[in-house]
Amino acid sequence: MSEIQQLQQQIRAFRDQRDWMQFHSPRNLAVSISLEASELLEHFQWITDEKSSKQVAEERRTQIATEIADVAIYLLELSDNLGIDLKQAIEAKLQSNAEKYPVEKARGSSLKYTELQ
């Protein structure tokens, strides 16, 4: 069993012990991912990139880690509930991105793949 599957198993057990599956529809989990991601963003709102990389990351490391974990938990549960192999999905997406953004065209560029020449 992979580490991802082990985490999904722990999340499933936590959820099932509390009889929360009834609330964890794919729609509700997707909404929860967005809400938790917004809570993560609040830690970086209205500050410079430099401050977000150093000062805030150090000052709020615990709170930021908690919000990242919240997003990850809902993401792992959503993929589990939908029968999506998250490792496989990530690897497929990385391969797709590698094809869309070849190193020789994309290095140092923030352009969308349709704009790369």
Regions found by a protein language model. Give the residues of each.
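Flexible "arm" and connector segments at domain edges
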Residues: M1-Q117
